[in-house]
Amino acid sequence: MAKLTVSDGYSFNQTDFDFSSLYYGWSYTRTGTLFRVDYGNGYVDEFRGTGFKYNSSGEPTGGTVTGYSGFDYGTRLFFIEGGSVAVTKIAGAAKTYSTSDDINVIAEVLRGNDTLTGANLADVMLGFGGNDSISGKGGNDILFGYDGNDTIIGGTGADEIDGGTGSDTASYANASVGVVASLANPAGNTNEAAGDIYTSIESLAGSSYADRLYGDYGSNFLSGGVGNDYLTGSGGGDWLYGGTGADQLVGGSNTDRFIFRALSDSIGSGRDTILDFTLAQNDRIDLSAIDASHALAGNQAFTYVGTAAFSGKAGELRYDKGASDTYIFADVNGDKKADFSIHLDDAVTLAKGYFIL
């Protein structure tokens, strides 16, 4: 699991890696753990690792690189750590003027579940293999996850967010205010999502504030995070998770799943409302992550009792159907009082099969 980190004040472009200048340095430092190239113009390449060996001309011929940094007049511009690649692969790439082999070297370093963090200017970062976390921070960034299930945080600026293959998420978890973010119509995005465009993104994650998240016509996973969020799945079979706060959830067409992972997700003034729970579309309410009984060890499933009153046994799930609303209640400690509740904005006759317990 490698880490690539960019320093503020430097605009980093990962596609610009070109090791062909390594043999044209002004001075060199060669030890078993350090290969350092000073180009005499303020720029320095520094490779750290183990078992470095050199031939009679001073060219590196063996060992493993585990860290790589670029410096400009003593200021580190970026560094890569935590990965590894054979010295011979970097040395081989340095002997060609094509950048494709240089990019392949970096792709090998970033083949795992890596963390890439940009800085305050426009960056270009590529995750390659694995389930990566890529954060652009400031600037108008181009962020590409490639393979795996990636989480991409554009940050401030108008960012191009491309998940590549896998199930990928555009996240606004670090946003300083709530956002409007839409996979179907990103032109309407606001705040830190403004100007962002999405390619091959299946999921959206909100901030710690009130967000409005919209899916597209595919199957999406929308996660509100903290705050009173509004989530709309649109088309496709969507999974919606409001998180904490009084959230409003709209699945849209097709079979949708409304997910609750903790009692705090929908309790008291933070109770969630499902605006379009539709039996004909086989919508489901997923409570499987919640331990239904605090009286027993482990994660217990709820016992569905329909419209019957709580009996005093921990783990019961019931509902009340009104003229235009339905309320779902859960008792996890057996005191006959609801510890968790969900509001359905319609009169719905429920059955056990509509829940994932």
List each model region and its residues.
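Acidic, glycine-rich calcium-binding repeat modules characteristic of RTX/beta-roll
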Residues: 1-27, 117, 122-199, 210-303
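Short amphipathic beta-strand/extended segments with alternating polar/hydrophobic composition
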Residues: 43-50, 74-90, 180, 197-200, ...
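N-terminal helix-cap/turn-to-beta initiation motif at the start of protein domains
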Residues: 106-111, 249-250, 348-350
